[in-house]
A protein has these predicted regions:
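PP2C/PPM-type serine/threonine phosphatase catalytic domain
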Residues: 1-196
């Protein structure tokens, strides 16, 4: 069975952020066939839809998506920005982040220029890659990975609003017989207590 799950998150300091996210998701829907998405196509759609109006020029969004094109057990993960995809592994009963943010801090980490656990100014979290309603904006190709899922593994696609509050190592475990609604309520309670 073929399917696609995605989340787009409008960048809060850009104009009409919610409209940017909606437009990015709409760009995905324009492609009726399930196939690997091209970041350039989504970028061009956003430009065509929003860059030519004064109030929406520069509207920006991130995107994370998971696709299954029918290959047994394998999913394709694509993302730009700081929306993420997580895996809950039934094997080790832990959540694992499958994507890396496209920001300056992550770039420094990849280059070995920062110390784990160190405090860094919030400016280092600035995004390096995102979609933007500006014809001069260049977007890189998606970061694409494949993941093999085993029985009772679970995937979660989310925005930075979740992982900025609580890292996945603190998330409640997902039990095989647990209803998704119960897990989501546990997660919401955990997030609420972190923000209090």
């Amino acid at each position: 069975e073929q399917w696609c799950v995605a989340v787009a998150d409008g960048i809060s300091n850009s104009p009409v952020a919610e409209q940017a996210a909606y437009t990015v998701l709409n760009a995905l829907m324009q492609n009726k066939k399930i196939e690997t998405c091209q970041a350039f196509t989504i970028q061009q759609y956003l430009v065509d839809q929003l860059a030519h109006q004064k109030n929406s020029f520069g509207a920006s969004s991130t995107l994370a998506l998971i696709q299954n094109n029918g290959e047994q057990g394998f999913v394709t993960i694509q993302h730009i920005g700081d929306s993420r995809v997580y895996l809950f592994s039934q094997h080790d009963q832990k959540w694992h982040c499958l994507t890396r943010d496209h920001n300056y801090l992550e770039q420094l980490r990849e280059n070995g220029e920062i110390k784990e656990g160190g405090n860094y100014a919030s400016i280092y979290g600035a995004l390096l890659q995102y979609f933007c309603a500006d014809p001069l904006h260049e977007v890189m190709d998606f970061t694409t990975t494949e993941e093999y899922l085993t029985e009772n593994d679970a995937l979660l696609v989310c925005t930075d609003g979740v992982h900025d509050v609580m890292e996945c190592t603190e998330w409640p475990a997902l039990k095989v017989d647990m209803e998704l609604r119960a897990w989501l309520l546990d997660m919401k309670a955990s997030l609420d207590s972190k923000q209090a």
